[in-house]
Regions:
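Soluble FAD-dependent oxygen oxidases
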Residues: 1-142
Length: 142
């Protein structure tokens, strides 16, 4: 894993967060958590790897605050390369949707895992017109 992290870091900086799991939690707490929308593989993860970029606020048309699309595309490309190395080394792993790769190619499995079908059925029942959508949220693929 050290070689994987070093290879990925050649493209973009990474952070490892060891405070995200339920390590040491009671069996009861883990069982409760498995009933939520969180991908169950996340409950067994040793850490969360974050590869991210940020910029100051961009406001099209406001002088001095225009988005730098070239810089953004470069950052997205480098992050995608770093994430590919990590994904290739951790097949079947998942992601926490609130801090996940915006361009996640297999987001239904990565974010929701075995919960996706159950969550999609709930979504179709309570929001049959699919009015409430977010990028890579349940039902957004339609």
């Amino acid at each position: 894993m050290a070689d994987t992290l070093i290879s990925a870091a050649k493209y973009w900086r990474l952070e490892l967060h060891f405070n995200k799991g339920l390590s040491g939690a009671t069996a009861e707490a883990i069982a409760r958590e498995r009933q939520t929308s969180v991908n169950p593989v996340a409950l067994d993860a040793a850490c969360l790897i974050i590869v991210a970029a940020n910029e100051r606020g961009a406001y099209p048309g406001v002088p001095g605050h225009e988005p730098n699309l070239s810089k953004g595309k470069t950052a997205a490309d480098m992050i995608t390369r770093a994430m590919k190395i990590i994904r290739d080394a951790t097949p079947g792993s998942g992601a926490y949707p609130n801090e996940a790769d915006y361009f996640e190619p297999d987001w239904q499995r990565s974010f929701w895992g075995v919960n996706h079908a159950r969550l999609l059925a709930i979504k179709k029942k309570v929001d049959p017109d699919n009015l409430f959508r977010v990028h890579h949220g349940i039902g957004s693929e339609t």
